């Protein structure tokens, strides 16, 4: 039986495990908003390892995502509509190894393995750095280089729609601030052409970065993802979501996303989608 047959047969299991969070050491349980200017009070129950915040463009999805990230990491910045609010009245309950803990902007220590990830921004930084330093001086002196394993290559090919003979990753450090970033070299099947990150289209480059990030993320992490649909066609979005479900299940991740794409939302249950809207002068959030 091929890897593709096995993976496709188990996709329903991955999504079920995302929904029921069986054997997860970390479970985000609830989000509470009380007495916060500009916001209606809300008590939101979170029942899935994958939660998406949706709403129209410009409504503040990113601000809310960054605020939740900031409360858990204690790195609160660029929170937009919340910047002048009393954010200490926003609390998040998480079960960690069977024990419930409450986090606010001032309560609880910053958690390990909490990351905010925006593939589009990372892709832009990488391309800008390539344009600034086309010879890539010092990039590969201490970089970690490897080829993606077949089990990951299956998903890469399905998501990008390309048949790669191999995907080589160089994890580059010490070039862009404290950011570790991937530099790719790929070869397509039945082709003599080898090309690298700077020769890729925006969609292909962003997808490879997003896939790399999920492979690179440690087990039992909490990952915040900013609009994964940007520059990506609907079919790739759907296949990316299947890979995300596979990764959440195998690594026991908690993932929160901001999105306005129906293709990103469609495989998720209604109880895993939070709707951000504006009612009069106040914002509302509901599921």
Model-assigned labels for residue ranges:
Residues 2-17, 125-202:
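Extended helical coiled-coil dimerization/tether regions that scaffold
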Residues 15-65:
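Pre-Walker A-like glycine/lysine-rich segment at the N-terminus of P-loop NTPase domains
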Residues 75-162:
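Nucleotide-state sensing region of NTPase/ATPase domains
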Residues 200-225, 234, 238:
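GG-anchored amphipathic helix commonly corresponding to the ABC/SMC/Rad50 NBD signature/C-loop
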Residues 239-244:
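Conserved hydrophobic alpha-helix in the ABC-type ATPase nucleotide-binding domain
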Residues 258-260:
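H-loop/switch region of ABC-family ATPase nucleotide-binding domains
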